Amino acid sequence: MYYDTIVVGGSIAGLLTAREVSSKGFSVLVIEEDYEIGTPEHCGGLVSIAGLEELGIIPSKKTFDHMIESAKITSPNGENFTINSKNQKVIEISRRELDKQVAFQAQKNGAIIKVRTSFQEITKTGIRTNEEEIDCKIFVDARGVSSLIHKDRTGILSSAQYEIYADWIKKGKVEVIFDQEKYPGFFAWIIPSDEGKGKVGIAGKGVNVSDTLNEFLKQKGEFSTIRKIFAPIWIKGPIKRFVEGNTVIVGDAAGQAKPTTAGGIFTSGMGGVYAGQAIAAFLKTNEREELDNYQKKWTERFGKEFEKQLLARKILERMDNQTINKLFETITPDIINEISEKDDFDFHTSSIIKLLGIKGSLKTAQTLVSGELKKILG
């Protein structure tokens, strides 16, 4: 059996790659090791409407949960402030339904999708699965963070996310909690799916994520757990090469998730779109430079922002709770209003800088990170 392109991994980036390649009339097979497209759903599910539109997705009723109205940011000592996020037009979506929606788009273009089919290895002419050998011209690695584990473990954090029912979850109101002792290098989050229902998670370096999340929930109040997801997240930015021979790497497998939040529906999704367009052009012309255009386009679009986010991550990792508390004290109503007025959810380094109070306390921050701070502010 032969396909022009085989995509391993049925998540957003892989499915968008398949959609783009098949839209040009080329044969595409997508294989997914899980029993269903869209599982396990380890994504928080936040994305801007503008981002979805650029990906070519109009969320269906099943996909769209609700608009996010605000984000409450809490420091280690419990001080907090709230950002109005209505201007950013951020929505909470069901990743399971979003992935299925894109799978349907790809299938309508002619792509074949198979679940409960696992990739085993690359062969001379294609790949071997748990069922058979299949020939192809292009192999797309969309396996997520699992594809990176053997390459560089230093960019990986453990995470846990529970889907729960709890009266203290309020529709439209996201919460982010910083605490370098409990969630070193990351944070805890509450993302509502509806009134009294949502996703609560934590990530951090060297922590027992299950115990830490259980303790966090215990302190919040009564709840019922309906789903638990444990998954590694990648925070080190893009890998060096998105294309190696006839292998094209997309999404989390290519490090296309944001270094600050590990979110990547838009940035990874655009990786899939650019990759699919490049693969289709290559299959038509057989010119290798067509494949190289994928990394070139993605880097032109997201490269500088990801560099700044990596620097912001370095700053956060060097701060202790005392420093974060002091920086939170410098956040003024003007800073909060400035962030609230922004309408760009997907390019947000400037907001992160202000959230940490760095512009309001340049002296303090400079003693922490010196030259790195100048780069990120520049």
Range-by-range predicted roles:
Residues 1-13:
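Beta1/beta-strand and adjacent pyrophosphate-binding region of the FAD-binding site
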Residues 5, 26-28, 139, 174:
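Hydrophobic anchor at the start of a short beta-strand
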Residues 10, 105-225, 239, 255:
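Predominantly flavin-linked oxidoreductase catalytic cores and closely associated redox partners
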Residues 13, 36, 146:
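Conserved Rossmann-like nucleotide-cofactor binding loop
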Residues 22-42:
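Glycine-rich FAD pyrophosphate-binding loop
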Residues 50-101:
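A conserved beta-strand/loop capping segment in the N-terminal third of enzymes
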Residues 206-284, 293:
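FAD/FMN-dependent oxidoreductases across multiple families
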Residues 280-378:
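C-terminal helical "tail/cap" subdomain of flavin- and related membrane-associated enzymes
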